[in-house]
Amino acid sequence: MKRRDFVSGVILSGAAVTLGIGCKRMKESESGTENLSPVLSPAPGGKTIREPERQIPILAETDVLVIGGGPAGTAAAIASSRAGAETYLVERYNHLGGLWTGGLVLPLLSTHAIDRRKRQRQVIFGIGGEMSKRLTNLGMSIHEVNPVVDPEAAKYVLDEMIREAGVKMLYHAWASNVIMEENAIKGVFIESKSGRMAILAKVVIDCTGDGDLFHLAGEKYDVMKYAIGLVHRLGNVDQIDKGRPGYVERNIGGPTPIKGVNWVNMWGKEEQDALDVVNLSELQMEYRRKIWESVQEIRKTPGYEDVFLLDTASQLGVRMSRILDGEYRLTLEDTMTYRSFDDVIGISGAWTTMLYRGRKIPASERPLWQIPYRSLIPKNTENLLVAGRCFCFERELVEDTRIIGTCLVTGQGAGAAAGLAVREGKAPRDIDRRKLKDLLKEQGAWLG
């Protein structure tokens, strides 16, 4: 039996899905990740347990299903719905925005980049630009370039945009498996307090950040271990008394739109496995302890006595995990040479220094770069698109492909493509790329 024929062991019948997980042990080579170690070691003695077959209720049948409500997923759902497709959005937490909101990674990077005339210009438009403008109008955004936003205001704005677009929102639910028919994805199993259910869809968009769906569908990918951190916010930073005897400068992060509140980033430990739940749990506790101890030390410093820990992020700062092996792998050379693509779905910028041809080029000099639609398409699975930090690119681009702006751009591109595919009754890989670009322009995206 081929991997794809087994993936979920499903039979669609009536109003329920028969699920037979645990029918056999999958070989490592069948996952397309033969060079990878298992995420977790099995129980001592290699013990396993069989999950009984059961009937799974179908919650909904829809045009487009987006899994993951971070910047990419939110933009994808809005774009899909605005394109006329009935759209469901499933998010495991109680908010949209992912690391932008729940992760307290508050800067919208990178809204600007250098064009061919060596001028700095705005590159984030469309749905991402609309989000930014709404936050500015609320007084909840500071800085014109790479604005820093208030997370609660951003949650509100994203909720409103989802509601206005007519997206069907499902919080507190987690995708647990995919429903496959030969090489086509037909839906997703979700877990929640309501139990296991299925949502069937004509097109599914993987915006999980970790590529959970394309992994479950059997696509090939790379795994990149990277630094994982935890952001926190400090309050009363406007009460710091620099005139106190013994005052010394302390690292208290950067300002936010709320007076007296700063956000403080943490790079964290290098080479961390974001796919290992035990590792994530250990990091969560360790980082929270370190942040608490750090703030107590700050409060002992003359002049900082009134500073307090406002909150730690509800999400760990996972920067990278799975990277899709898709139809086209975006390269460093592409992004540094203004390469144009016939199937461009958006443009992003850079926020960090890049070593290129033996020279360190600062972000302030780095060019804007196009993102091709092919980089969002898996090689084998039909009716599946990928957006966010796990689309197809070279590892050297990790600092630019994982930022909020890029996630918004890839999300809108995938959502518009999904809506167009449903409208035309085609698989996403078969849609007319010119029509996709026209649709994106109608939605306000800038394609260069």
Predicted features, each with a name:
Residues 79, 85-86, 91-177, 232:
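Conserved N-terminal/central alpha/beta ligand/cofactor-binding core
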Residues 59-70:
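Beta1/beta-strand and adjacent pyrophosphate-binding region of the FAD-binding site
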Residues 1-5, 27-31:
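N-terminal secretory signal peptides
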Residues 73:
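N-terminal Rossmann-fold NAD(P) dinucleotide-binding loop
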Residues 5-25:
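N-terminal export signals
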Residues 46-61:
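A short, basic/flexible loop-to-alpha-helix module at the beginning of a structural domain
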Residues 179-197:
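Conserved beta-strand-loop-beta-strand element in the redox core of flavoprotein oxidoreductases
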Residues 55, 127, 155, 172, ...:
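Flavin (FAD/FMN)-binding glycine-rich loop and adjacent Rossmann-like elements that form
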